[in-house]
Regions:
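Beta-hairpin "wing" of winged helix-turn-helix
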Residues: 30-31, 35, 63-72, 78-79
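N-terminal helix-turn-helix
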Residues: 36-68
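General helical structural elements
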Residues: 45, 60-63, 75, 94, ...
Length: 121
């Protein structure tokens, strides 16, 4: 498994940031519903974190009902969780991130044409 270079933020525990990465992976189908997640060791190596940190991220995802353990096999993403995550993440984005982004776009006079073309001309 290829390492993913990652810059961890100082204002949040690494296991929480790792959980966010895994949730993003569920949302973008890197970790599809019903599929196995990497082993704790594999996840730790991939993100260059301590295996205890990877295990804690998995425990918290399990506690949140997003993944389940299959005895002797590992963890899988539970079926049906992506839709709920998508709803939650959209609501969070619209409440927490969009207002600031929209204000910045207005200050810079960026319109939809510019956004979709990727050009300021």
């Amino acid at each position: 498994m290829k390492k993913r270079p990652h810059k961890w933020k100082n204002d949040q525990a690494i296991y929480q940031q790792l959980m966010d990465e895994l949730i993003a992976g569920i949302l973008d189908h890197t970790y599809p519903e019903g599929e196995m997640l990497p082993s704790v060791r594999g996840l730790a190596e991939r993100y260059d974190v301590n295996p205890l940190t990877a295990a804690k991220a998995y425990r918290e995802l399990q506690r949140a009902g997003l993944v389940e353990a299959l005895r002797g096999e590992g963890l899988i993403v539970r079926n049906g969780v992506r839709a709920g995550l998508m709803k939650r993440e959209r609501a969070r984005f619209l409440k927490e991130e969009w207002p600031e982004l929209r204000a910045r776009l207005a200050r810079l006079e960026v319109d939809a044409r510019m956004l979709f073309s990727g050009s300021a001309d």
